């Protein structure tokens, strides 16, 4: 799976951005509070999972914005595909022009693994937390 393009609108502090990653490894860098983690979170949502940073979808919508919209073009399963996420009080999703019953239907279409500072519990907590993290990460791999 390869991300070809990402269009973000009103997602947290990102009012509008279009990103076309280069082939291979891409490095995201910048000053604090400029949206690096927000960018990664917007990509993560296309895995069909919930945010790794908040419980309520509305928290992902930019200040004073009525909604957030993320669109991704990616190459997977031998062809170029697209997915759209619309976020207001909840998330709705489309894949290749078809509205999905739930964003969870994207699970297995796009793969990503996030390791965030909050995951330091992997070292500090017991085996139950480690197993849960590994189960989730392994579900993202083929």
PLM regions: where:
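Pre-Walker A-like glycine/lysine-rich segment at the N-terminus of P-loop NTPase domains
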Residues: 1-45
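Nucleotide-state sensing region of NTPase/ATPase domains
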Residues: 47-129, 134-141
